[in-house]
Amino acid sequence: MKQFREFIREGISTDTKELTELLVDTVYSHYIDDHDKNSIECVGWLDGTENAQLRFQKIYEAGIDEKDSVLDVGCGVAHLHTYLKNQGWNGKYLGIDPNKKAIDLVDENINAVHATVEDIGKNEKWDWAIANGVFNLGLKEEHSFWIIEHMISHANKGIIFNMLQAPYPDSNYVAYYPEQIKHKLSRFDHSKIEIVENYMPKDAEFTVYFYV
């Protein structure tokens, strides 16, 4: 007989999948339809190329080495892959995204599939699991941490993700206090947790380095 905790976890899993599908249908598919795949707007970044590059820089600065493997959760059209290649990185890459329209636009030489992090085999590991902009819209805290927990389970070195910083002026988005996130992450086995702030105009977001 299933334990109560198992029912709760199954409920969160189902809710996360349903919310993700809803976001794809109502939001992200329209960005793909309306913008060129080489633009950052096609994956929902509406604050300019300079800010998008800054996000990639902060992700890279977590310590991604030249041959490190990367699992890109919510990869969109794999812009992160392009950025890493431009830094001299040459590791194994898998991009996953629930938006099939986005995956269909990814260059054929880039390993990307229509999937979510729950679809990844339990024993599959990458040095880094990365989520760029995944937690900004439509997912409640419990759903975001469901994804984060799965990312940790697939990481050899660590996970990297960013979030909007509370208080955030637009209530349509989901924002968090950095110390709140650090506290919640501390329950997972780790060697270090680092919060990177003060890099974005108006301190609008922060990046988390979680080292396993």
Q: Locations of the language-model features?
A:
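A short acidic, Gly/Pro-enriched loop at the edge of an enzyme's catalytic core
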Residues: 121-129
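Class I (Rossmann-like) S-adenosyl-L-methionine-dependent methyltransferase catalytic domain
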Residues: 7-63, 67-121, 142, 146, ...
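A short SAM/SAH-binding and catalytic strip from SAM-dependent methyltransferases
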Residues: 128-141
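Conserved acidic residues
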Residues: 68, 127, 157
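Short acidic, low-complexity intrinsically disordered linear motifs used
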Residues: 1-6
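A short glycine-rich, Lys/Arg-flanked "PGG" loop and its adjoining helix->strand segment in the class I
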Residues: 145-157
